[in-house]
Amino acid sequence: MATAPYGVRLLVGAATVAVEETMKLPRTILMYPMTLASQAAHVVMRFQQGLAELVIKGDNTLETLFPPKDEKPEWATFDEDLPDALEGTSIPLLGLSDASEAKNDDRRSDGRFALYSVSDTPETTTASRSADRSTNPKTAKHPKSAAKPTVPTPAVAAELDYPALTLAQLRARLHTLDVPELEALLAYEQATKARAPFQTLLANRITRATAK
């Protein structure tokens, strides 16, 4: 195949490129805003980075020309900064000294009044005994109180060995008792131990049995 002239090849190549760019034109138009935004963001970031580098260089230059002084605030004092005159001095503990003085005063006052208290002890004890005898003649004559009257044990209590029953055991046996037996147990409980849980249990059982 014969080679075409140079001018023809140039025109054909230009036409081909024009056709390809024309075919890419819709895609280029759609991507152009995104490309423009990314380029703008890149330019802004480069600008900020340049400003930061300039500031850092300025700080370094200022520190070189004007070195900072080691300043320490007045309130920042440490143990090693205190003068040597304070070494060896002791601070009196006011609370401990006051407490020791108060204890010494209490001991002295106890020692002073101990003689009077010892001398007055026999008289006060005899006076108190005579006063007790005069105010309580019945207790002196009858030191022992009268014993409580014995409560008769109902038959149902003796049958169940009621005094030895626990609350759970009594609850388990309530369904086998009728109303008179429950009332007898309640009266016996009130007259003897008067335990609130037992009284409540018996009273509730009597109420339910009566309602039936």
From Swiss-Prot:
Disordered as annotated region, ranges: 97-151
Disulfide bonds: none
Basic and acidic residues: compositionally biased ranges: 100-111
Domain of life: Bacteria
Any single GO CC term annotated in Swiss-Prot or TrEMBL for this entry: cytosol
Signal peptide: none
NCBIfam families tied to this protein: LipDrop_Rv1109c
Protein name (Swiss-Prot/TrEMBL): Uncharacterized protein Rv1109c
